[in-house]
């Protein structure tokens, strides 16, 4: 599966299929013995997409060809997504607790935070994603009779287009502090689009705005290509018959911490392995191909 600069997708193809994969992992993580997240919408959304493998996965019908290694890979993927999800959940709830009432979820996919988090009165949540993705989730959540816990405003646009203008046209207030998330997103953008994304966020952000994202410090073209293949191979061992390789854009990328710092953000960064410890999950130190072992969780505040 090869990316192009102007490609598009729904939730059953290309980058969209990875959103369905992540939702499936959230569904599994929500039903574990000691779950650190709770996403009751993940499994119904995955079933609605209709990709057979992920439907069978959330329904407990997948048996890896290599049970020992496949089950371990699946647990790793599930735990990794659980930790990532909890980090961003805590980010948004913390920002809301501190008085921020405007939030933007970039590349929202099947994210259900607007429905499942405990938002305060007056909170407005913007979800930005491809038109087909937004339409599908909006219709599916309505069919599930789900009600947002905040005022939800969807913005149907590709992040490689003029999404800031689309956001403002949907009521975004540049004078209000905002909490922003770019979760599981950067590797799917060309390097120059990553920089442009942060430039746009900065331009739209009032002082006191916050941002959460994640990045790979050694994200060179070769490394990203190798990791994309490892990512695909792990899911193949679990039994996935969908080609997830070739989805990451190659090329030298800016260091996210340095880039944001240079634009006025106060940045803190923590390796994902530290988050595993925070949330009481075991990090697989002996696994050389653990999912993005050097991934760094970033939180920042402007001004």
From Swiss-Prot:
Task performed by this protein: Exhibits S-adenosyl-L-methionine-dependent methyltransferase activity.
Annotated positions binding S-adenosyl-L-methionine: 129, 158-159
Presence of the UniProt keyword Oxidoreductase in the record: no
EC number: 2.1.1.-
Name this protein carries in UniProt: Putative S-adenosyl-L-methionine-dependent methyltransferase MAV_4435
The keyword Methyltransferase belongs to this UniProt entry's keyword annotation: yes
Organism encoding this protein: Mycobacterium avium (strain 104)
GO biological process: methylation
Enzyme class per UniProt: transferase
Record keywords, A-Z: Methyltransferase, S-adenosyl-L-methionine, Transferase
Assigned protein family: Belongs to the UPF0677 family.
Domain of life: Bacteria
């Amino acid at each position: 599966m090869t990316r192009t600069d102007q490609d598009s997708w729904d939730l059953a193809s290309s980058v969209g299929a990875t959103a369905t994969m992540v939702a499936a992992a959230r569904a599994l993580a929500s039903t574990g013995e000691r779950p650190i997240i709770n996403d009751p919408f993940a499994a119904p959304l995955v079933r609605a997409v209709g990709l057979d493998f992920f439907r069978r996965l959330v329904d407990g019908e997948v048996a890896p060809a290599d049970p020992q290694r496949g089950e371990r890979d699946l647990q790793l993927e599930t735990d990794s997504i659980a930790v990532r999800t909890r980090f961003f959940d805590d980010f948004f709830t913390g920002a809301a607790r501190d008085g921020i009432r405007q939030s933007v979820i970039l590349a929202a996919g099947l994210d259900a935070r607007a429905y499942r988090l405990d938002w305060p009165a007056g909170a407005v949540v913007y979800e930005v994603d491809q038109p087909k993705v937004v339409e599908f989730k909006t219709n599916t959540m309505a069919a599930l009779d789900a009600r947002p816990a905040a005022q939800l405003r969807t913005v149907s646009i590709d992040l490689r287009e003029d999404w800031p203008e689309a956001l403002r046209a949907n009521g975004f207030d540049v004078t209000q502090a905002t909490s922003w998330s770019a979760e599981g997103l950067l590797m799917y953008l060309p390097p120059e689009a990553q920089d442009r994304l942060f430039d746009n966020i900065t331009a739209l952000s009032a002082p006191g705005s916050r941002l959460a994202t994640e990045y790979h410090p050694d994200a060179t073209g070769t490394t990203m290509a190798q990791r994309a293949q490892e990512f695909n191979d792990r899911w193949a061992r679990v039994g996935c018959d969908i080609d997830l390789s070739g989805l990451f854009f190659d090329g030298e990328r800016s260091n996210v911490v340095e880039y944001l710092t240079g634009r006025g953000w106060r940045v803190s960064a923590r390796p994902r392995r530290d988050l595993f410890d925070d949330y009481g999950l075991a990090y697989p130190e002996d696994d050389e191909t653990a999912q993005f072992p050097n991934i760094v969780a970033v939180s920042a505040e402007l001004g």
